[in-house]
C-alpha cells in the first residue's frame, strides 16, 4: 500500500518536474529570454537608427517628385515624430509642401521680373550687335525707322516738358559726382529720382581707349552740370554678352524711361572727340544747355559793355 502511494507521488511530481524542465528547456529561463528579447529589440532599434542617419546623409532630389511622392517622403521623414507626438496627416504635409512651392514660385517670378525690367531699361538700338553681315546691311531702312521713332519720342518729350514747366517748375536735385554702379543698383539708380532728373549712364571697359576718354569727360561734366546724375557701369556687368564693338555706350534716362542711346558713341562723335563735342551732342537733345549759345551770350554781353566806351571815343 505504502509502495503504491509512494509510486503515485513520484509519478505525480515527476511529471510536474518534467513539464517545468521542458518549459525551462524551451524558454531557457524567463529572465534570460526577456533579456535576450530586449537586446534583440535594442539591436533592431540601433539598426533602424543607423538607417535613419544614413537617410539624413543622403540628399534626395525632391524637385523631380510629384506632389504625392513628396508628401509621402515628408511623412516618412517625420514618422518618428508622428508616433510620439501629434499626427499632421497627409493633408498637413501637402499644405506645407504647397506653401513651400508657392514661396519658390514667388521668388522665381520676382527674379524674372527684375531681370525683365532691367532688360527693358537697356533696350538699345539695333546697333548693339556684332559687326553686320551683308544681309544685315540691307536692313538700313529699319535704322531710318528707328531714327524717326527716336525723334518723335524726343518731340513728344519736349512738348510734355514745356507743358510741365508752364504749370509748375519742380525743384532740381543736386548731384555733382560721377559714380560707378553694379547690376544690382542699375534699376534703383534710374527709378528713384524725380521725373525731371536726367540720368546718364556710361557702359564701358577699361581697356578701350575711347571709354577711358569718355570717363574723364563725364567726370568733368558731372561737376559742371550738378543737376544731372552721371553713372558708369562695366558693360559685362550690365549685360553678360555685351559686345565691345558697341562701346563706349551712352544711355540717357528721364522719368525712369530710356530717352536716347548712343551705341556706340563713336558713331556720333568719331574716335577723337573732345568735351565740347560731347556737350554739343547732349545739348542737341536738350539734356544740357548749348555751350555755343552760352559762349555767344557771354561774347555779346562783353561786347555790349564795351560799346558805350567806343561810342564815346568816336564822339570825341
Swiss-Prot record:
Keyword check for GTP-binding: no
Domain Phosducin: 95-290
Positions of the UniProt region annotated as Thioredoxin fold: 175-316
Source organism, top-level taxon: Eukaryota
Entry's localization field: Cytoplasm
Keyword tags: Chaperone, Chemotaxis, Coiled coil, Cytoplasm, Sensory transduction
Protein name: Phosducin-like protein 1
Naturally occurring in which organism (per UniProt): Dictyostelium discoideum (Social amoeba)
Amino acid at each position: 500500500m505504502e509502495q503504491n502511494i509512494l509510486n503515485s507521488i513520484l509519478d505525480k511530481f515527476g511529471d510536474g518536474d518534467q513539464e517545468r524542465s521542458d518549459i525551462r528547456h524551451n524558454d531557457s529561463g524567463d529572465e534570460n529570454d526577456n533579456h535576450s528579447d530586449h537586446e534583440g529589440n535594442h539591436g533592431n532599434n540601433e539598426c533602424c537608427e543607423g538607417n535613419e542617419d544614413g537617410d539624413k546623409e543622403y540628399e534626395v532630389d525632391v524637385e523631380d517628385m510629384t506632389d504625392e511622392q513628396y508628401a509621402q517622403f515628408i511623412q516618412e521623414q517625420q514618422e518618428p515624430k508622428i508616433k510620439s507626438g501629434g499626427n499632421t496627416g497627409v493633408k498637413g504635409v501637402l499644405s506645407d509642401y504647397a506653401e513651400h512651392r508657392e514661396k519658390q514660385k514667388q521668388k522665381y517670378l520676382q527674379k524674372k521680373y527684375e531681370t525683365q525690367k532691367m532688360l527693358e531699361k537697356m533696350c538699345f538700338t539695333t546697333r548693339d550687335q556684332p559687326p553686320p553681315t551683308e544681309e544685315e546691311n540691307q536692313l538700313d531702312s529699319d535704322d531710318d525707322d528707328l531714327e524717326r521713332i527716336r525723334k518723335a519720342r524726343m518731340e513728344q518729350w519736349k512738348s510734355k516738358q514745356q507743358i510741365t514747366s508752364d504749370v509748375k517748375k519742380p525743384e532740381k536735385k543736386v548731384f555733382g559726382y560721377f559714380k560707378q554702379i553694379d547690376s544690382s543698383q542699375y534699376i534703383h539708380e534710374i527709378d528713384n529720382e524725380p521725373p525731371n532728373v536726367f540720368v546718364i549712364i556710361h557702359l564701358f571697359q577699361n581697356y578701350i581707349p575711347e571709354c577711358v576718354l569718355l570717363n574723364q569727360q563725364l567726370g568733368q561734366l558731372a561737376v559742371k552740370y550738378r543737376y544731372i546724375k552721371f553713372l558708369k557701369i562695366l558693360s559685362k556687368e550690365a549685360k553678360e554678352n555685351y559686345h565691345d564693338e558697341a562701346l563706349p555706350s551712352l544711355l540717357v534716362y528721364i522719368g525712369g524711361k530710356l530717352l536716347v542711346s548712343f551705341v556706340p558713341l563713336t558713331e556720333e562723335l568719331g574716335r577723337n572727340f573732345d568735351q565740347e563735342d560731347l556737350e554739343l551732342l547732349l545739348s542737341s537733345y536738350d539734356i544740357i544747355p548749348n555751350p555755343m549759345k552760352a559762349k555767344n551770350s557771354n561774347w555779346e554781353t562783353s561786347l555790349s559793355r564795351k560799346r558805350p566806351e567806343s561810342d564815346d571815343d568816336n564822339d570825341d
